Amino acid sequence: QAYDKSHNELKASYIEIDLQRTKDGHLVAMHDETVNRTTNGHGKVEDYTLDELKQLDAGSWFNKKYPKYARASYKNAKVPTLDEILERYGPNANYYIETKSPDVYPGMEEQLLASLKKHHLLNNNKLKNGHVMIQSFSDESLKKIHRQNKHVPLVKLVDKGELQQFNDQRLKEIRSYAIGLGPDYTDLTEQNTHHLKDLGFIVHPYTVNEKADMLRLNKYGVDGVFTNFADKYKEVIK
């Protein structure tokens, strides 16, 4: 339902999917490695089978935390699999997918690429037009994907405070496999944004929820932002 709202109502540019994997090997969309925060369950996603995960209520927490945006229909929402999302929105939607470190879920990258291929999202036309972007904080995960398919656009996520530690050698090494950089928005200045663009990166900061920050970052020249308020950002870029 969150994906329906962002895709159908708010017309967000991309459907963002954070991937975890169940005990029986299914890729599912969930931000955290545990189910504690966003369901009525406890423990790690990898300790649940898909059937067990589907028993959990993944919607009521949102109604409680964000009463202003609450909907009765969110109650008992189910955790979707990657395949269910790709099936629902089809090959013409845009997907921005985050992988974890390979040591958390070994083989996740191969699985993800197999799913994207099955849903006709890996043909060169789709990739050239940016229908799929894959991001990760893990260099190794991105490198694994790049080794398997060098046409998939990759974005290196950067922890808060880390960007300032990157010298040009490090940035160029990242640029050898990733087309984009995803820093915490508070780490961007006009100067370092221009420098990243000069090195050939697209720049997609996270998570920008205030209009003033959106305006400032657009002035710096970012290529887009991650936000919880796609409608607000659409007003800014009109």
Where are the predicted features?
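Phosphate-group recognition and catalysis centered on beta-loop-alpha active-site segments
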Residues: 1-238
